[in-house]
Amino acid sequence: MEKRLIIAVLLSIGVLYAYSFIFPTPKPLTAPGAKQAAMSSASAPALPAAVAPTAGTAPLAAPAPQAGQAPAVAKDVTVDTDLYTAVFSTQGGGLKKFVLKKYKETVGPQGKDIVLVNETAANRYALLSDSREFGLSPDALYSASTGEVKVTNGGKGSLEFTTTTSQGITFRKVYTFSGDAYRIGLTEEVQNAGNVALTGAVHLLQTSRVVEAKKEGRYEVHAPSTLSEGKVKVDKLDNLLKNPVQYGKDIAWSAFADKYFMDGIIADKGSISQVRITRPANDAIQRDIVSPTVTVAPGQRSAVNYAVYYGPKDLDILKLQGNRLDEVIDYGWFGPIAKPLVHSLKFLYKYTGNYGIAIIIITFILKLVFFPLTHKSYKSMKDMQKLQPKMTELKEKFKNDRDAMNRAVMELYKTHKVNPLGGCLPMVVQIPVFFGLYRALMYSIELRHAPFYLWITDLSAKDPYYVTPIIMGVTMFIQQKMTPTNMDPVQAKMMLMLPIVFTFMFLNFPSGLVIYWLVNNVLTIAQQMYINKAVAD
């Protein structure tokens, strides 16, 4: 097979792969895997000073007459930090609303804050607790330790909800907050003030909102995932309409994420035994996070810890949460390439203050790294081009004997020390880097609403006037015209269609990715001019 045909095939495959990566089939939305709360009959974990328990195995003092007695009407409790505002309810001790302060829905001063939780999803709050064995209802009314929590400048705060069940169980939910972190601590504690030992598990019901998938914006990717048995498993929303999903081994976390934001429940020391995912309504999914079964003797207590995360899918922030939560960002097969590129972008941004400039610098660096391979590729193409007249003679001479022609061609390559794949293989090596950079740019929250210059105000969105993709197509055409070729006329025409195909594909690409491809083309043209001159000399 001629070298040019191989290149044509590889480029065609590359186009198909690029198209599938750029326009993936929208993933059905599903609820993040529910996390199980591990109930240990050992000592209760440390709680804020205002609610610190006695030793885990010590008998509990009988509660005061009003202890755990909840008000008849549900009330809201607002938690305000530097990063978010959360509204909890004494109904279920659940999360009613969660608003991010640092991120907006749209570009510009009129953009509203991102809302990750609202009360409309299946008419259920998030982070509700349920246990039939302990007589606890998810809609139970709790008493709150305070009516408002305000945490700033890296300070700490806490909120405690308490209720008493008909079985004589006092149930406490304690949230702990940091002014400078999205991570929220959650402790659920069962205290048995009755006369009979009770056995059961506590369920943490996490409801997440489902939004119709869209081609552009944060809901382009919208799905739940669970890290179970060492693997990240993503569930499809359509399947959940008929069949709930359950995980029951080595659960580290469960999350529900769109393209840029997520909510997640992170296990603490095996605190999750099962995760059950259902779709109770079209606009919601629910994760039932089940704790291991535990027996609580009279006068004893048992507690379980989680970390709750509501916030951006920032690679560095998620890495700090532990339990491999950063793997909620799906870079696919190209993760080992994409992650270093993301870190490189963030590093360069510290010095440039502009992610567009950072992309250009990375493009230039990659071009330098691959220059030896590219030089070798173009030199091989030039050598093949010089042999084209002799190749034509051999084809004419052995037109009726294909085997003889192939032997003669191989002998020609050997005589002139030409590798027919020499111009192709160096380019193939660069393909994983391109897709790795594509994934890095496509799913980096850092590029969301990040401006470049002039009319490009959001590097994660398409060019509103299509200027950069059109220029990119022109540079790709120029690049192809400068590239040595020994194709027949039909193949040459097919290759000239690629700039047109790529231009239409890139019309809806994030402008950050278009800038990369455009700058790469310009550098390739300059490189080709240099190589052509060097070869001629």
Curated annotation (Swiss-Prot):
One of its GO terms (molecular function) is membrane insertase activity. HAMAP family: YidC_type1. The chain crosses the membrane at residues 5-25, 353-373, 418-438, 495-515. Interacts with the Sec translocase complex via SecD. Specifically interacts with transmembrane segments of nascent integral membrane proteins during membrane integration. The keyword Transport applies. Gene3D superfamilies: 2.70.98.90. It comes from the Bacteria. Keywords: Cell inner membrane, Cell membrane, Chaperone, Membrane, Protein transport, Transmembrane, Transmembrane helix, Transport. Required for the insertion and/or proper folding and/or complex formation of integral membrane proteins into the membrane. Involved in integration of membrane proteins that insert both dependently and independently of the Sec translocase complex, as well as at least some lipoproteins. Aids folding of multispanning membrane proteins. This is Membrane protein insertase YidC. GO terms for biological process: protein insertion into membrane; protein transport. One of its GO terms (cellular component) is plasma membrane. Belongs to the OXA1/ALB3/YidC family. Type 1 subfamily. It is found in: Cell inner membrane. Pfam families: 60KD_IMP, YidC_periplas. It is a multi-pass membrane protein.
